[in-house]
């Protein structure tokens, strides 16, 4: 089960999210009516115009702990941050697709995933593939995440990075 995060708060950069169905990428177009804005005195249309609308990231749900409930199993939200859960676990640290100039005197650069392609799994599939495009002033990258949820969730990450200039 896919759940999209709305742009807003700390997460102001929209990302493109696509679903791969029968080997074709299908964009998941932003629709304000997908979200419940509650009692806020702002219409979804106003929010779209103010923030540019869009999705900030996504999470996937899977029956980790029970066959009757879909638990959050992985989340991609903000810059190149992602994290996954195993059965009975709680979130701890997040991982990053790439850290550039971390703890340097000139300041850290935060590369960001700008587009995702989520391969729609077949019924009863044991894994899901997620592809991502990473971009920053210093680097570009292409990622393949193979997520295998379970007692010990495993995520195989393959990345191809291309540097535009030297980094620390």
Describe the role of every protein-language-model region.
Residues 28, 139-141, 167-168:
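Short helix/loop capping segments that flank catalytic or ligand/cofactor-binding pockets
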Residues 34, 64-66, 134-136, 151, ...:
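Short loop/turn segments at secondary-structure transitions that flank enzyme active sites
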Residues 92-150:
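Extended, loop-rich substrate-binding clefts of extracytoplasmic carbohydrate-active enzymes
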Residues 11-13, 54-56, 124-128, 139-141, ...:
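Residues at beta-strand starts and edge strands
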Residues 6, 47-49, 87, 105-107, ...:
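Generic structural signal for short, flexible, solvent-exposed coil/loop and linker residues
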Residues 144-168:
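Acidic (Asp/Glu-rich), glycine- and aromatic
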Residues 1-104:
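Solvent-exposed N-terminal domain segments of exported/luminal and surface proteins
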Residues 18, 59-61, 131-133, 146, ...:
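Residue-level recognition of well-ordered beta-strand positions that form the cores
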């Amino acid at each position: 089960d896919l759940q999209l995060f709305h742009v807003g708060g700390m997460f102001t950069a929209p990302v493109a999210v696509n679903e791969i169905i029968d080997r074709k990428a299908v964009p998941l177009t932003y629709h304000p009516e997908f979200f419940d804005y509650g009692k806020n005195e702002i219409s979804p249309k106003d929010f779209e115009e103010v923030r540019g609308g869009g999705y900030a990231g996504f999470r996937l749900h899977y029956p980790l702990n029970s066959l009757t409930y879909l638990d959050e199993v992985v989340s991609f939200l903000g810059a190149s941050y992602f994290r996954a859960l195993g059965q009975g676990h709680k979130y701890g640290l997040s991982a990053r697709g790439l850290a550039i100039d971390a703890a340097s005197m000139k300041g850290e650069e935060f590369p960001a995933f700008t587009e995702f392609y989520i391969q729609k799994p077949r019924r009863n599939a044991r894994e899901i593939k997620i592809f991502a495009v990473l971009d920053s002033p210093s680097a570009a990258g292409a990622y393949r995440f193979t997520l295998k949820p379970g007692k010990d969730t495993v995520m195989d990450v393959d990345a191809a990075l291309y540097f535009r200039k030297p980094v620390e």
